């Protein structure tokens, strides 16, 4: 395997849950929490209480502060992360700046500011985001929304010719990705049935895509493919693709490679720059906790973000073609309004409009927490916690009459091939009753009809003690 997965396969877990008969007890889980180096991060987040989940109003009352009201077991960070406690402070500071400075807040700094003036707030976001995805600061822009960013990137990187016009993607890609790719193909007056290559699982009951299968499809269509666009982590199964190996293989065939990292950013230890990825995009409201529909981000490798000043004014393109907007323009000339577009170097040159400072504050509130640790530490906790939860589930009592458990786990069993997610395929007809039972016990998970629930133990705020309770 490539270094991406091979490195993680060699990680030795300090946990002994597979051989310890006490692993199913609360006391054992509490001992794991006691030795967790990330345990103090939980207090940095607001976990909904069981009472909160059942409230019919949003009005704040004293009961919401009742310490006897237990927190819910929130295992849905792969769908929407919980609120960082400091989000309110960041947003309050933004509102205060807007209130007392108005338009001058774009340029005037404050001694007690959390973020720079409005005009530079996107730079602060990029600086904090870069280490989370393994990128240079210049390769990241915090901007827009995920599907819009995919369109912007494909406008630059999908440039079909008569010979190369196909896009390779998962057969069960997230619907918005599928729609975006299909519409880009139609935009170029091509037929999706000719230009979309869908990689389907070989086993319907175990819907994962083997790396060898993906590479084989790339080989079969190499001479006619313009772009490979896959998910870093597959939203349905939780499978972590071998980004480095797939990228290198496709590029060796002259194919550009992009990744939707919606379920990977803030989840696994990405190395987008080192893996030579051409481009990537992701949302920030899942593992990165920016709030519903929060501002997204994109990555453009430095080789694609260069601006050749020697070619400015010549017949040669000084920069990669793209959809352009004023916020992507050179800062030195941005406010001259001369209508001569010259982009900033790097991913910032792919920006279009000025960013929502309100949304940027919500993103940065969480990124600041991630920057207090490292993705390597977060990933190690994820490997431990997801493995522990898997162990508990695999030892769930079987039905006495059939000898079978009422579910199977369709997420890869190899820890290096998954993130902080386990997808459980339930026996037909069980979904509604299982969800009802979980809701009664204050457990929040994600459903994918007809029969799958996705469980995501988020390393920064979930505890080991929660998992025996969830299993029960």
UniProtKB/Swiss-Prot annotation:
It comes from the Eukaryota. Keywords: Cytoplasm, Hydrolase, Pyridine nucleotide biosynthesis, Pyridoxal phosphate. One of its GO terms (biological process) is anthranilate metabolic process. It is found in: Cytoplasm. It catalyses: L-kynurenine + H2O = anthranilate + L-alanine + H(+); 3-hydroxy-L-kynurenine + H2O = 3-hydroxyanthranilate + L-alanine + H(+). GO terms for molecular function: kynureninase activity; pyridoxal phosphate binding. Pfam families: KYNU_C. Pathway: Amino-acid degradation; L-kynurenine degradation; L-alanine and anthranilate from L-kynurenine: step 1/1; Cofactor biosynthesis; NAD(+) biosynthesis; quinolinate from L-kynurenine: step 2/3. Gene3D superfamilies: Aspartate Aminotransferase, domain 1 (3.90.1150.10), Type I PLP-dependent aspartate aminotransferase-like (Major domain) (3.40.640.10). The modification N6-(pyridoxal phosphate)lysine is found at residue 286. GO terms for cellular component: cytoplasm. Its EC number is 3.7.1.3. Pyridoxal 5'-phosphate binds at residues 146-147, 174-177, 231, 260, 263, 285, 326, 354. Its cofactor is pyridoxal 5'-phosphate. Its main location: cytoplasm. Catalyzes the cleavage of L-kynurenine (L-Kyn) and L-3-hydroxykynurenine (L-3OHKyn) into anthranilic acid (AA) and 3-hydroxyanthranilic acid (3-OHAA), respectively. Belongs to the kynureninase family. PANTHER family: KYNURENINASE. NCBIfam families: kynureninase (TIGR01814). Homodimer. This is Kynureninase 1. It comes from Aspergillus niger (strain ATCC MYA-4892 / CBS 513.88 / FGSC A1513).
């Amino acid at each position: 395997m490539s270094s991406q997965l091979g490195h993680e396969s060699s990680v030795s877990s300090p946990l002994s849950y597979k051989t310890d008969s006490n692993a199913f007890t609360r006391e054992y889980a509490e001992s794991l929490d006691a030795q967790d180096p990330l345990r103090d991060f939980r207090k940095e987040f607001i976990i909904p209480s069981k009472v909160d989940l059942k409230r019919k109003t949003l009005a704040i009352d004293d009961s919401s502060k009742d310490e006897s009201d237990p927190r819910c077991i929130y295992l849905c960070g792969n769908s929407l992360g919980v609120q960082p406690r400091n989000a309110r402070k960041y947003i309050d500071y933004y509102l205060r700046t807007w209130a007392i400075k108005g338009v001058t807040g774009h340029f005037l700094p404050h001694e007690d500011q959390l973020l720079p003036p409005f005009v530079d707030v996107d730079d602060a976001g990029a600086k904090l985001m870069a280490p989370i995805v393994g990128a240079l600061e210049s390769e990241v822009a915090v901007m827009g929304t995920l599907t819009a960013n995919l369109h912007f990137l494909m406008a630059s990187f999908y440039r079909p010719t008569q010979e190369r016009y196909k896009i390779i993607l998962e057969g069960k890609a997230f619907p918005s990705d599928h729609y975006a790719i299909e519409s880009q193909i139609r935009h170029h007056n091509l037929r999706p049935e000719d230009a979309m290559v869908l990689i389907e699982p070989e086993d319907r009951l175990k819907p994962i895509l083997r790396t060898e299968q993906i590479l084989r499809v790339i080989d079969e269509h190499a001479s006619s493919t313009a772009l490979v666009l896959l998910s870093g982590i597959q939203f349905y199964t939780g499978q972590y693709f071998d980004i480095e190996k797939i990228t290198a293989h496709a590029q060796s065939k002259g194919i550009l490679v992009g990744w939707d990292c919606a379920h990977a950013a803030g989840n696994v230890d990405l190395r987008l720059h080192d893996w030579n990825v051409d481009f990537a995009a992701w949302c920030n409201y899942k593992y990165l906790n920016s709030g519903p529909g929060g501002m997204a981000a994109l990555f453009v490798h430095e080789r694609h973000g260069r601006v050749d000043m020697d070619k400015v004014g010549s017949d040669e393109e000084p920069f990669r073609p793209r959809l352009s907007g004023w916020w992507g323009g050179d800062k030195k000339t941005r406010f001259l309004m001369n209508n001569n577009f010259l982009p900033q170097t790097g991913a910032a040159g792919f920006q279009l409009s000025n960013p929502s400072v309100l949304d940027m504050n919500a993103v940065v509130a969480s990124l600041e927490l991630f920057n207090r640790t490292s993705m390597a530490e977060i990933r190690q906790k994820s490997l431990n916690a997801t493995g522990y939860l898997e162990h508990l589930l695999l030892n769930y009592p079987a039905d006495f009459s059939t000898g079978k458990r009422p579910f199977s786990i369709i997420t890869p069993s190899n820890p290096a091939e998954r993130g902080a997610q386990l997808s459980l395929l339930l026996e037909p007809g069980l979904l509604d009753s299982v969800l009802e039972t979980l809701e009664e016990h204050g457990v929040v998970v994600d459903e994918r009809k007809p029969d799958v629930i996705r469980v995501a133990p988020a390393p920064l705020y979930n505890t080991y003690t929660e998992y025996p309770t969830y299993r029960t």
